[in-house]
Amino acid sequence: MPMRKRHFYRLLPLASLLLAACTIPVSKGPATSPTSPQWRQHEQQLQQLGQFETRGAFAYLSDKQKVYARFFWQQTSPERYRLLLTNPLGSTELELVVQPGVTQLTDNQGKRYVSDDPQEMIQKLTGMSIPLESLRQWILGLPGDTPNFTLDDKYRLKKLTYQQNGVTWVVNYQEYNTQVTPPLPSRLELNQDGQRIKLKMDSWTIK
């Protein structure tokens, strides 16, 4: 019996080592880096999406105001798009039509405004700071002009940080729609100095 006990205790450290080896996380290495071929392929697929539509829920949250709406985004070419915000009753709160060199905004009273800077116009008229030029890329899961981004284990955008004119936006991708090809974001959140923009895409139509 004593010899059996010694034999038993001698096996315990070996078993512990085997269990520890099984629980050591495997490093993914450079596979999910921005230079990986899988990301490059996914990025190229996204860049080819010249026409698409998506609709869902929009929330803008800051210390000064909270806005909840339904949204419809229609992209007809890389430089032409339409953004529609509606209230829970389905009435239009804001319609933005962007074309090269000119932007037209129609408010909930039917009054129209024209500008060459959609982001500045929305901020002046609604108080909401929305980085529209970058959002056109971010909504698809593209990093746009920033090199500061990370990928998830499926080689899709996970998080990005964008800085311009002293303003820093951090975008987190929380969920993807894998029912479309290529997979497209279904939930993302933008943060900038106390401001949050939440987008939940209920559907995508690729043309």
UniProtKB/Swiss-Prot annotation:
Pfam family, any one: LolB
**Presence of the UniProt keyword Lipoprotein in the record:** yes
Q: Which InterPro entries match?
A: LolA/LolB/LppX, OM_lipoprot_LolB
Which range is the signal sequence, renumbered to this chain? 1-21
Question: GO BP, one example?
Answer: lipoprotein localization to outer membrane
One cellular-component annotation, GO? cell outer membrane
List lipidated residues, N-palmitoyl cysteine. 22
Q: Look up the domain of life of the source.
A: Bacteria
Report the subcellular localization: Cell outer membrane
* Record membrane topology: Lipid-anchor
Covalently attached lipid (S-diacylglycerol cysteine), positions: 22
**Does Chaperone count among this protein's keywords?**
yes
Its predominant location is membrane
Q: What PROSITE patterns has UniProt attached to this entry? A: PROKAR_LIPOPROTEIN
Keywords attached to this Swiss-Prot or TrEMBL record, sorted alphabetically, are: Cell outer membrane, Chaperone, Lipoprotein, Membrane, Palmitate, Protein transport, Signal, Transport
Q: Which family does it belong to?
A: Belongs to the LolB family.
Partners and quaternary state? Monomer.
> What task does this protein carry out?
Plays a critical role in the incorporation of lipoproteins in the outer membrane after they are released by the LolA protein.
Q: What is this protein called?
A: Outer-membrane lipoprotein LolB
Which organism's genome codes for this protein?
Yersinia pseudotuberculosis serotype O:1b (strain IP 31758)
Q: Please name the gene that encodes this protein.
A: lolB
